[in-house]
Amino acid sequence: MEEKIGKVILDTTCYPGKDLYSDGAIEDEMLAISRDFAPEEFNRVISERKSWPILYHFSHIRENILSWIPFTGEEKVLEIGSGCGAVTGALCERAKEVTCIELSMKRSKINAYRHQDQDNLKILVGNFQEIEKNLTEKYDYITLIGVFEYGESYIRSENPYVDFLRIISKHLKPDGKIILAIENRLGLKYWAGCTEDHFGTLFEGIQGYPKTKGVKTFSRKEFNGILEEAGNLKADWYYPYPDYKFPMTIHSDRHLPASGELHMRDYNFDRLRLDLFQESQVYNTLLSNDLYPQFANSFLLVIGKEQPQTAPVYVKFSNERDQKLSIYTEISEAADGQLTVKKVPSQKKAAAHVRNLGTICEELTGMYKEEKIEVNRCRLKGDCAQLEYLTGITLEDKLDHLLEEGRTEELEKLFFSYIQKVKNIHEKNHFEKTPEFVRQDCNGAF
């Protein structure tokens, strides 16, 4: 049987007739939100309701986990465990066809209502094992975002997690890939005082789940064993920060964080936490000892039968702001090893902002030339602004080094010499307050 919500098809052939799991009354509230509010209003609703489930299921930041994946627009995607559709919209915007599998009818309807204008979305409602028997399509991508840890619930077997990947792999095209996001069982946040995400207790995962069953996350070593046992699968490893739920930066083995880069700590939106030590300092120690991949809070894997070699090696999002200015920065590696930097609009409304970066670059080049400060060259390529990938010591690094060594006089001299150069440039250029500047309550003294 099929029914439609807007343009979205819900196939209920394998639906058992009632939802076998639910978060209770909050799901009724979320269904009403998805039905009664446009996606553009979700952030306002999140702000007003002040509810963890509403933030978790409706925040656009959730899409950051895969919105940067280099889709061509011709892909067929299978999303397993689509829930309320936190990342479904990002897939629909980038792929040709999206098929979701979700056990809960209510969550499927939430997904359908919020994406009812998408004509390339079909939701199969029911148990994965029942639906999987009837899948005949081969997919370019299969996604498991916050799903793999529930493998014991999806697959009834002696080795459910290995079998889960084996079964999924059968539905990939020869060059197809699995996108899998999951918490790291040994993530630093758990040592620092955050509770285990699924059970809400301290140290449950890092002690090996001695008191709980049904959900399980893995260390990197454990996951490599699962990949090998599932058919010697290969993976590109990424590390969403602060975690995969609300990632603002995504590093990889080919582009790990720099010292001092990991400093966020206020990301436990769902529960209180302990502060047992300063995470930023411990991260620096882990980085200097090549241990960060073992203790990253979350993993994002792009898995294939052959090594995927996904082009982007680093992504940083700047999309907690007006949609007209919402972008992300991507560093990609070509087959010859050459690195390039791109500024990419996160929303269609931000395309004009990215195009304007080329004009800004030209203007700054002229302004800074007299002070012998070179501006990173920028050129427009499609909807993106492409910049050079430069290596070297930044002014910030130099100042930090001088501070660590107690060379404060040199630090002050270097810092204020740069400040003077900037002042010399801008004293020649009158700052004009535009109407937009005044509207944003930025009418201070300059």
Over which residues does each language-model region extend?
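A short glycine-rich, Lys/Arg-flanked "PGG" loop and its adjoining helix->strand segment in the class I
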Residues: N159-K177
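Conserved kinase catalytic-core helix
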Residues: I360-K372, E396-D441
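ATP-binding glycine-rich phosphate-binding loop
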Residues: Y292-S298, P308-G337
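Conserved class I S-adenosyl-L-methionine
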Residues: I179-L202
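Conserved SAM-binding loop of SAM-dependent methyltransferases across substrates and taxa
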Residues: C84-A95
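ATP-binding glycine-rich loop module of kinase domains
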Residues: L325-L357
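N-terminal auxiliary segments of SAM/dcSAM-dependent transferases
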Residues: M1-F37
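Short alpha-helix
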Residues: K213-W237
